[in-house]
Amino acid sequence: GLRMIGTLAKYAKYLPNGFITKLLEVRVTLLPPVARLTSLHQPQKLIEYLSRHPEPTESETTFAYYDWELQMQITRLSGNPVYALIFNDFASMFKKMAIPYFRSEMSRSASLQYYSYLSKAVAHNADTVEEVVRFAMQKSIEIWHEVRGSDASVHL
């Protein structure tokens, strides 16, 4: 089951190359429609959270915490508590990968752009929220490959 993801995070050095990419692809599938639901049910709370994004000069740890909490806010505010339960199982793996990911200025810059676009989409057009989130999640896979190298392995 999903609890396996937390266990796998403990033994990340044994995961096959490309495993993290597969997890990120799952996120591309799950998070965009959930974000759309959140923009319909609780847009103001999401906009409020997005307004507190980190500054470009803040640490990778700050970015990692903020970004993970954004994903959890999206799932919690969606109106369906099952989404939060599913994403919560990704927490340990995400935290393990997020610090090296956010060491890159490119990652932080792309994330800040995503937060801005998402805030505007939530405020003006719920239909574009899904597209904004999907694009950002796909872009994060590309950045992960650049940051971690061609094999995108998990040897963090």
Describe the residue ranges of each PLM region.
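Short phosphate-engaging motifs
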Residues: 30, 82-83
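Intrinsic-disorder/low-complexity, polar/charged segments
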Residues: 59, 77-80, 104
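Long, low-complexity, charge-rich intrinsically disordered regions
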Residues: 76-79, 86-88
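All-alpha effector-binding/dimerization core of bacterial HTH-type transcriptional repressors
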Residues: 1-69, 73, 113-135
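C-terminal all-alpha effector/ligand-binding and dimerization domain
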Residues: 51-56, 71, 88-156
